[in-house]
Each structure stands twice: as C-alpha cells, then as structure tokens.
Amino acid sequence: MEITSDRRYALPVDAQALWSTIERTHSYQDWWPWLRAFDAEALRVGDRWRCVIRSPLPYLVRVTVALSEVDRLHLVSAQVSGDIEGTARLTISERPDGCELRVESSLAPKRPLLRGLARVAPGVARFGHEWVLDTGAGQLAEYLRAGPKGPP
C-alpha cells in the first residue's frame, strides 16, 4: 500500500527565515521530539540523513533520506529508504503573512510489520503518516514563532 500525500502548511515567517532554520539540521530534534535519532551533515544534494521516528503508534520507523535536489529558499527533494521507501518533496513559496510549505510524498512500507499494518488497517497506517506530517508542521511553526535558539 502506497501512501500519497500533498499537504500545505502556512508558516509565520518568510522563506528566508524558514530556510535559515531548516539549514540547521543539528536543531531538528529541538522542535521534533518524536525524532528519536537523527544524523545529518547538511541540507545539500547528496547528503544522507539517518532518522529514527517515533510514530503515535507503538513502533519506531528507521529511514534514510537521500537529498536529490536542493534549491535554496524554494525546494528540497529526496529519496526515502529503509522501513518506508519512496519520494518526498518540500516546496516553499512566499505569502503576504509568511510562507507556505508544501509537502508531497509517495511512500510505501517495506518492513514486514508496517506492510502488514498497512494491509489490514490502511486507515491506521495513513493516520500515523499524517500525524507525523501535521504534528511536525505544527511543531515547526511553533518553533519559528518562538524564534530559533543556538548557533547558525
């Protein structure tokens, strides 16, 4: 079962401020407590991010995110592999009151537990996926409103 998403989130800062925040990969766990482990060098083409995600369901998801396209202030595309595989794309556009983050993904479970869950309870699998997206966007917006802390 493939889960395809196309979500849009209004954020309270302009594209430059958002980009400055997401470039600080060492800070991701500050606003995403469900990101249990995260290893990334930078937001640049060719980088491979290793992630352990704690979903709202009782399991961890381990993935590698390989950045395939990075267009500063506008776009990030990636290939996802591991427990879940597929593609993801973030697009940033300006708005009068901040910016919009569009998150598009097409992902399928590869780990047997997750494949089984998606097969017998597709609504539960979609809930877990959407929870990570929506909660993550909300936590990022909250972090942006508070103003990022720490070194650039």
What are these model-derived regions, one by one?
Residues 79-134, 151:
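Beta-strand/loop substructures that line and gate deep hydrophobic ligand-binding cavities in soluble
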Residues 1-45, 152:
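Hydrophobic ligand-binding cavity/cleft-lining segments
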Residues 30, 39-84, 135-152:
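Glycine-rich portal/gate segments that line the openings of hydrophobic small-molecule binding cavities
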Residues 2-8, 48, 62, 75, ...:
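Intrinsic-disorder/low-complexity, polar/charged segments enriched in Ser/Thr/Lys/Arg/Asp/Glu/Gln
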